[in-house]
A protein has these predicted regions:
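Sequence-specific dsDNA recognition surfaces
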Residues: 4-50, 56, 62-65, 69-72, ...
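A generic structural signal for residues embedded in beta-strands
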Residues: 269-270
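Non-catalytic DNA-recognition/assembly elements of restriction-modification systems
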Residues: 1-32, 120-162, 181-214, 335, ...
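Basic, amphipathic alpha-helical recognition segments used for DNA target recognition
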Residues: 3-10, 43, 60-129, 202-208, ...
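Short, solvent-exposed loop/beta-turn-alpha elements that line the ligand-binding surface or hinge
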Residues: 174-176
Length: 389
C-alpha cells in the first residue's frame, strides 16, 4: 500500500443536466445523488460505472452495473486508468467523502475537492482484484439473501390476498371458499359482502395492547447509548425484523418509561410523519412517539394483521415513500376497521406462513452478520492491515 493522489487513480467528471420534464421514455437509469431518479433513453456511461453524490446527499458512492445516465447532482468516474472498478468502489466507500463537502446551504462536493486527496491504496492489479473479490463476494451473498426474502415475503402476501381479499381460503373440503360457492353475507359497515361468520371489529378490539412510544428526556445523556433498541421510522425501513437501531437507550433511560417496553414479535407501525411503515421487533426495545405498537399479539393474529395493515396503509396512504402525511393518533390507530376472519382460518394461515417469516427472520440476522463482517474488513483491507498476498 502507498499514499496516492485520488486523481492519479481515477478521473471524476460532473454529471449531465437533465430536467425532469426532459426525460424521454426509455430503460436507462438516471442516477442522482440519492440513487435512481428515473429512466431516460440516452446512455452516457456504458456497462459499469461509479457515481458519487455531488450536491444534496454528498459523498456516497453508487456502483452501477449497466449502462446509465449520471445526473448533474453526481460526479461520475470518467476514467478508471486501468484500475479495478470494484476495488475503486470499495476504496471510495472507505474514505468517508461526505467529510469533504462544502457550502453552508445545500452541501456540495466537486472534483477539485477529490482529485488532490492523498489516499492509502494499491496500484497492483492482482491485489486490487483480490480485495474486490473478498468484499464483493460478501455483498453478493447479501444480495441473494435479500432476493430470497423478497420472494418469501411476496409468497406470504400472495397467500394472504388469496385467502383474505379474494376470500378463497380453503373451505371444509379444502376447496376455495368463495369460488366454490361459500356463503357471503352483506355487511352494513363495509357496504359489501364478507364470508359468513366473519366479523368487522376495530384493531383495538382484536388486539387491545397498543403502546405509543416515547422519548426519555434528552437533558440527561445517561438515558441513551446503552444496549436497548430505540426504534424510529428509519430503523423500521431497514428490515422487516428489527435487530438494530441508530439510537439506543440505557437501562436507566428505558426504565424511566417501563410501560413502553416491547419484546420480540411485537408489531411496530409508524403513525406520525410517514404513516404505515411496519416492522416486527427482533429483541427488547422501545420506540419514539411516532410509532404505535401492537404488544404481545396472539400468534394467529400476528402475520394476518401484519399483512392486513400493510395493505390498509397502501390503500389509504402513500406509505413508505418518505413523504409527510396525515398523522394518526393512538385512538385512530386502535379504531382501524378490520375484517376479522374466524379464528380457525387465522390459525391455519399462521401455520402456513410462520415458516416463511421464520426464514425471513433468519436471513435478516445473517445479512446483518455479513454486513458487520464486510464493514470490519473494509478499512483493514484498504490500509493493508490484512494481507491478501
Amino acid at each position: 500500500m502507498e499514499k496516492i493522489r485520488l486523481g492519479d487513480l481515477v478521473e471524476f467528471q460532473r454529471g449531465y443536466d437533465l430536467p425532469k420534464n426532459e426525460f424521454k421514455n426509455g430503460n436507462i437509469p438516471v442516477i442522482s445523488s440519492n440513487g435512481i431518479l428515473g429512466y431516460h433513453n440516452e446512455v452516457k456511461v456504458k456497462e459499469i460505472g461509479i457515481t458519487i453524490g455531488r450536491s444534496g446527499t454528498v459523498g456516497f458512492p453508487y456502483l452501477i452495473k449497466q449502462d446509465f445516465f449520471p445526473h448533474n447532482t453526481t460526479l461520475f468516474i470518467k476514467n478508471f486508468n486501468g484500475n479495478n472498478v470494484i476495488y475503486i468502489y470499495y476504496l471510495l466507500k472507505s474514505l468517508n467523502l461526505n467529510e469533504y463537502k462544502s457550502g453552508s446551504g445545500v452541501p456540495t462536493i466537486n472534483r477539485n475537492h477529490l482529485h488532490p486527496l492523498k489516499v492509502t491504496a494499491t496500484k497492483n492489479k492482482e491485489t486490487q482484484q483480490k480485495i474486490a473479490k473478498i468484499l464483493s463476494d460478501i455483498d453478493d451473498k447479501i444480495e441473494v439473501l435479500h432476493q430470497i426474502n423478497d420472494n418469501l415475503s411476496e409468497l406470504a402476501k400472495t397467500i394472504y390476498d388469496y385467502w383474505f381479499v379474494q376470500f378463497d381460503f380453503p373451505d371444509e373440503n379444502g376447496k376455495p371458499y368463495k369460488t366454490s360457492g361459500g356463503k357471503m353475507v352483506y355487511n352494513d359497515i363495509l357496504k359489501r359482502e364478507i364470508p359468513e361468520g366473519w366479523e368487522v371489529k376495530s384493531l383495538g378490539e382484536i388486539e387491545p395492547n397498543i403502546i405509543t412510544g416515547k422519548t426519555p428526556t434528552t437533558k440527561d445523556e445517561n438515558n441513551f447509548n446503552g444496549n436497548i433498541l430505540f426504534i424510529t421510522i428509519d430503523d423500521i425501513r431497514q428490515n422487516l425484523f428489527i435487530y438494530n437501531s441508530e439510537r439506543t437507550l440505557s437501562e436507566k433511560g428505558a426504565n424511566t418509561q417501563r410501560a413502553k417496553f416491547l419484546k420480540k414479535g411485537d408489531i411496530c407501525v409508524s403513525c406520525i410523519g410517514t404513516v404505515g411503515v411496519i416492522g416486527i421487533v427482533g429483541k427488547i426495545a422501545q420506540t419514539n412517539q411516532q410509532i404505535n405498537s401492537i404488544s404481545n399479539p396472539q400468534n394467529f393474529n400476528k402475520y394476518f394483521l401484519l399483512n392486513y395493515l400493510d395493505r390498509y396503509f397502501k390503500d389509504n396512504f402513500t406509505a413508505k415513500k418518505g413523504a409527510v402525511l396525515d398523522n394518526m393518533n393512538k385512538a385512530e390507530f386502535e379504531s382501524i376497521i378490520i375484517i376479522n376472519p374466524i379464528q380457525n382460518i387465522k390459525e391455519i394461515y399462521y401455520g402456513k406462513v410462520k415458516f416463511l417469516y421464520k426464514k425471513i427472520d433468519t436471513n435478516i440476522q445473517q445479512i446483518q452478520h455479513l454486513q458487520f463482517l464486510r464493514d470490519w474488513l473494509l478499512p483493514m483491507l484498504m490500509n493493508g492491515q490484512i494481507s491478501v498476498e
